[in-house]
Amino acid sequence: MFIKIAAKPPQLVYLEEVHGRTHMTETDRRKYYNLKIGYEGEKKVYDYLNQFKQGVCIWDVRLDISGEIQYDFFVIVNGIIFVLEIKNHYGNYTYKDGNLKSESGFVSRDVFSQSSNERDKFEAFCFEHNIHFKIVNEVVFVNENFKVINNVEGIKFHNMIAIENLAKYMCSFEITDEDIAIAELIIKHHIEKSKNEQKDYYPYDKMTRGLKCPECHRFLKVERSAKRQIVCSCGHKMSKTEAICEAFEKIEMLKRDSVTATEVCEWVDISTTRIRKVLNEYCYKIGENKGRKYKSKDKRL
């Protein structure tokens, strides 16, 4: 049973929308890829564990324990807190001196020692808050195409079978009030806003216009002649109202400012009259007539 799930990281949402619209720095391209792959791996674990009602599960917590530390999953069951670190590496790797190196040269450093350090810090958190459950930390490689090709003695590279076995273990026990109380205490100390947010933004006026599909993130052609629904080649469907709202939301994020109906029209081939009608209903209005701009209602202050 999940009592906290993760939203897609704001930095990933931003870079995902920028990708394909303008030239991104090499640093941001790497960051985008790592965030995307990491989120997809965590989502895979969430989708599997979310099938079960036993066990108390938490997805994505940042704690301040002598510095900010991000934990992928906590699973609390039968007097044990499982601390899961999820890796979504793909392809063939060699393991040496604590590091994983891919055939393309990518290096994942201190794979297990970093996890042990995070466990030690969480133990300190538990001691401070009088939590006496056993702590078990595991690094789990969830991509079925991940493989360590050299011989490594004494180290276990857990895969999705470890998650399946954990689910079976969860199903053997009922949730207790203490399980829930500990989970709620952990969530209470969650840092909502990370220090690792996007700091450098790209100029909107240099970006390619156009709506992207919320599912596959490819550019989506929205034609005025469409009757009721816009259908992406991936199968995702949107109403015209949803397309207008999606375009507005993403433009506002990319501009980091208020939005005009004309700017939305640059993304979706729908009449400005229809766009204004939708924005008037769902957004906060600034100004009148042709100079009118719009903001999300939760950002009007």
Segments and roles (model prediction):
Residues K53, G91, K96-N99, E153-I155, ...:
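Generic structural motif recognizing short loop/turn segments at the entrances and edges of beta-strands
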Residues D72:
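Cell-envelope/extracellular polymer assembly enzymes that use nucleotide-activated donors
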Residues V75-N99:
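Active-site beta-strand-loop-beta-strand hairpin of nuclease catalytic cores
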Residues M1-I69, I80, G105-E281, K299-L301:
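Surface-exposed interaction regions that form or flank ligand-binding interfaces
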Residues K101-E103:
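Conserved short loop/helix modules at catalytic or binding sites
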Residues Y93, C283-K285:
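Assembly/interface hotspot detector across virion components, adhesins/toxins, and nucleic-acid enzymes
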Residues V75, I230-C232, Y294-K295:
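Short beta-strand element of the conserved SAM-dependent methyltransferase core
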